[in-house]
Amino acid sequence: MGKKDKRWVLQRKNDHYYNLAKRRNYRSRATYKLFQLNEKFNLIKERNVVVDLGCAPGGWLQAARDIVGEDGFIVGIDLQTVKPLPHDNIIAIKGDMTKEEILKQAKDLLPEKPDVIICDASPNISGVWDVDHVRSLELTTMALMTATKMLKKGGNFVVKVFQGDLFEKYVQLVSEYFDKAFTTKPRASRDESAEVYVIGKRFNGKKFDMNSKSPIVKLLDTKPVEEEITSPSLRKEISKEDSGLMIKRIKEMRSKKE
């Protein structure tokens, strides 16, 4: 085991929320993030219907179930298979949350439109700040788009976002679809993490506008460019140049979209 691996194991052993989750049979320390977010913003209530986007490994499914109780209902969606949980009011679907057939499958399972949509999903991490920020925004914007397709009017939304240049513009975008938008970092988030949670309270019923002039929406059109600049061959070249080329290309991409 290398020094980095040993350091990671030691850090986890000393992690309060990791140990707490393990003792209480929660699948992830992130379970406590949702508990803390809900305590502060009253997002989920007893008997609510909840959809969890990017639900693997199931920590937020467990937290949501503890809050809604046996009379609530939760559907999770993830590209990975999620090990079943011992509750008949939790169902996890394997699939892409942006695909209409997967959304239809989720809607068909729900007893009614969801009261709350939650998303703690993370993109694949490259280790390059600008790239990870763009990937995070692409993922969270797709989550917002999905929320506007599914939420009942007056419903709530919470999503994890990585901080960066366009973070405030994402918050502004969320505020177009909800009466109030908030940002917060729960106690269970690690101090060194760039993650922040964006909360939308009381969905106004407006459908997602793909023709919006928001630079965040425009990012959804940049996937081919992003794939190009993060390809293994270019990453190898970039690592020799201290990642400068990658950062330059992403900034060029942003300026064109703005």
UniProtKB/Swiss-Prot annotation:
Catalytic activity: uridine(2552) in 23S rRNA + S-adenosyl-L-methionine = 2'-O-methyluridine(2552) in 23S rRNA + S-adenosyl-L-homocysteine + H(+)
GO molecular function, one term: rRNA (uridine-2'-O-)-methyltransferase activity
Documented EC number(s): 2.1.1.166
Record-annotated active site: 160
Main location: cytoplasm
UniProt keyword Iron present: no
Subcellular location: Cytoplasm
Enzyme class: transferase
SUPFAM superfamilies: S-adenosyl-L-methionine-dependent methyltransferases
Keywords: Cytoplasm, Methyltransferase, rRNA processing, S-adenosyl-L-methionine, Transferase
KW Transmembrane (keyword) present: no
Positions of S-adenosyl-L-methionine binding: 58, 60, 78, 96, 120
InterPro entries: RNA_methyltr_RlmE, RNA_MeTrfase_FtsJ_dom, rRNA-MeTfrase_E, SAM-dependent_MTases_sf
GO cellular component, one term: cytoplasm
Domain of life: Archaea
Pfam families, A to Z: FtsJ
Signal peptide: none
The protein's role, per its UniProt record: Specifically methylates the uridine in position 2552 of 23S rRNA at the 2'-O position of the ribose in the fully assembled 50S ribosomal subunit.
Family as reported in the entry's similarity comment: Belongs to the class I-like SAM-binding methyltransferase superfamily. RNA methyltransferase RlmE family.
Name of the featured protein: Ribosomal RNA large subunit methyltransferase E
Naturally occurring in which organism (per UniProt): Methanococcus maripaludis (strain DSM 14266 / JCM 13030 / NBRC 101832 / S2 / LL)
